[in-house]
Amino acid sequence: MVSTKVLGLLTAASLVVASPLNKKAVIDDCLSAASVPYNEKGSSQWEADGSPFNVRIPYVPVSIAVPFTTEHIQAAVKCGRDNGVKVTPKCGGHSYANFGFGGEDGHLMLELDHMYNVTLDNATGIATVQAGSRLGHVASELYKQGGKAISHGTCPGVGSAGHVLHGGYGMSSHTKGLALDWLVGAKVVLANSSVVTASEAENADLFWALKGAGSSLGVASEFYFKTFDAPQQATNFLAILQWDAQKSIDGFKQENFYSSSLYTDKLSDDQIESFVNYWYGAGKALKRDWWVQVDLHGGKNSAITAIPANSSAYAHRDKLLLYQFYDRVDLSATYPEDGFSFLQGFRANTTLGMEPGEQGMYFNYPDPNMAQGEAQTKYWGDNLARLQEIKAAVDPTEVFYFPQSVRPATPIEH
């Protein structure tokens, strides 16, 4: 159940005890005193919200707040900050690295899925989208309310916040750009619990940083998108697959996997040969469910590349190809050690002879095995230094921290 009851005041001594149990009591008491709904440990709602998408890395939050308003988010951020607990928003919860849980144990998780309103202003074409909305809901509401759309990814259950704040690649991206390219503003709760609007005209540095590295900087509670006319024609098709019903349902909830990603320019003949040889060698020898997805990301006719590289923190507009590497096993299985080296080998063989500056990685297809320094460089490239300065300005004590987040220019020790 979601609880709002006021707990008894804790003693000053209990506030400094570092055990997870006492931390939870402190945080829950703070949330309750501020009238912020939260999940009771052991309740069905805790089990639902606290179940990770990637069961290989099952991180456990110290507490789960369930905000319904921006004011709830403000109060929850204050509870975490004042009690030394990192704060992490979770929208759809589909981060491959479980970053919505914090990417590690012990965070105050903000479950945003009760904040899902979508409103279209037909006079301006501007859509207001709450951060807990899923992509399918956003798409259907924009079309229903005015025949409008934004560019976004293909999975309807993915949360809009994490998707938009780090890129938002999908089938429409080649002609319409990334989801973040349609963002014109956002309402953001900062580490000091203040609420600001970020746009080109207001808090422009923060707005630039949100578009590519948003989860490192604050909690966006509301987005403002320009929209375009949805296509008037669509192709209908029917595919009948021989699926096991229960396994199909389970597959939408959780998976057990390791993933990685890559951006590159056009591959040389030697690199193509190396990629294909690895596929037919190591790949064919691995008798389980793995796949590689290669998307035409950039190029001279791409709407992604047409937008200036300095328009946002998204760092890899110039890259032609975007790859996703994915290896999974049954939910109940122990993920095998050879899976890590297998996917890393795929990346290494694809980038044979390639300079570090000629490649990158996509935060929305994260590789959780990367160290923080390497991850920052691979995700944000030449934009990292500016991002670190902005991080230092808005969150110097890293209230919003996870193992691959942007660090401030002068980071503190954890």
Model regions and ranges:
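Soluble FAD-dependent oxygen oxidases
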Residues: V2-L10, S14-H414
